[in-house]
Amino acid sequence: MSLSAGLPVRPLLLLLLLLWSVAPQALPPRSHSLRYLFMGASEPDLGLPLFEARGYVDDQLFVSYNHESRRAEPRAPWILEQTSSQLWLHLSQSLKGWDYMFIVDFWTIMGNYNHSKVTKLGVVSESHILQVVLGCEVHEDNSTSGFWRYGYDGQDHLEFCPKTLNWSAAEPGAWATKVEWDEHKIRAKQNRDYLEKDCPEQLKRLLELGRGVLGQQVPTLVKVTRHWASTGTSLRCQALDFFPQNITMRWLKDNQPLDAKDVNPEKVLPNGDETYQGWLTLAVAPGDETRFTCQVEHPGLDQPLTASWEPLQSQAMIIGIISGVTVCAIFLVGILFLILRKRKASGGTMGGYVLTDCE
C-alpha cells in the first residue's frame, strides 16, 4: 500500500499514528509502558516528514521530535522542568541517533523492495512510509518485556527478538532485510540492552517525575444497548470516559463467561481529552437479551462493574412520556372548555368591558 502524490497525506499520517499508538497496545491492569513511535516518508516534500518521533508514558504524550528541527520538545507539564537534566539530555541524544538510523534503515528496506528513491524525469515518484514502534513494559510483579517492530507502507514488516538477537519477517518481502540485519550482531546486542535495561530504567525515572499525574485513574461508566439490523439482533456494551487505556470487557450468559470465539473483539479508541471509550458487541437471539451481562474491569474500579440491557425500564420511560403528554393535553382541553363556558355565560363581557366587533 504505497502513497501517491495526489493523496491527502497529512490526514493519513495522523490516522496511522493513531492506529499505531492505540490499537496494538492493550496492557494488563497496573502495568506501565514507555513507547516511542517513529514515522517518515521517502518523499517528505509531499507533506509527510522524513522523520517524526513521539514518546508516550502510559499512553500520555511527553516528548516529540522531527528531522527538520532536530530538537526534542517537551509535551507534558511534568517534564517541562527537566529539559536541562541529564535524563532529557540522554533522551535528546537518543532521538537524534534514532533519526539517523531510521533514515538508513528506510533506504535499506526500500532497496530490498527495489523501490528506488531516485525520481525519473517526467515521472511522479511514489512516497513510501516506514513506521517503527519500540519500547518496554514494567509489569505488576516488576518483570519487564520489550518490543521493537517495523511497518512498511502500512503493513507489518519486521520484529526484533531480544532472546535470539534475530529479526522475524512478517512478510516475504522483508526476508532480504531480515537476513542482512541478522548479521549485525553488535547492533542486535545494543537493541537488546536498550529494551531490557535502559528502557525500563528510563520508564521508572519518568514515572517518578510524573507521579500524581501519570497515576491518575478515571473510572468508567458502562451501559448496554440493543440494536436491530438485517443480520439480526445485537447487544452493545459501551465503556465511557476512562483512563488509563487498559480495560477488560467480557460478556456473561446466565452469569457464565462466554467463549472468546463467540464474541467480537473489544475496541478501544481515544476521546481526544486523554480519556478512552471502548465497546463490545454480541449477536443474540431475539428474546434472549436479558440473559446477557457485560462485565468490565478497570484500574479505576474497586471491583468489576456489570451492566445489562433493561427493556422494562425503557418501556416504562416511553409509557411515562406518553401518559404525561396525554394528561397535559386533557388538562389544557379542560381549561379551554371552562374559559369558553364562562365567556358564554357572561354574555360576552370580561372584567366589566363589553366586547364588540371592530367596524
From Swiss-Prot:
Alphabetically ordered keywords of this record: Cell membrane, Disulfide bond, Glycoprotein, Ion transport, Iron, Iron transport, Membrane, Signal, Transmembrane, Transmembrane helix, Transport
Domain called Ig-like C1-type: residue spans: 219-308
Predominant cellular place of this UniProt entry's protein: membrane
Location of the protein in the cell: Cell membrane
Region of interest called Alpha-3, as start-end residue ranges on this chain: 218-309
Function: Binds to transferrin receptor (TFR) and reduces its affinity for iron-loaded transferrin.
Topological relation to the membrane, as annotated: Single-pass type I membrane protein
Region annotated Alpha-2, chain positions: 127-217
Extracellular side: 25-318
Pfam families, alphabetized: C1-set, MHC_I
Disulfide bond positions: C136-C199, C237-C294
Leader sequence segment: 1-24
This protein's name: Hereditary hemochromatosis protein homolog
Family classification: Belongs to the MHC class I family.
Region (Alpha-1): 25-126
Molecular function terms, GO-annotated: beta-2-microglobulin binding; co-receptor binding; transferrin receptor binding
Region (Connecting peptide) location: 310-318
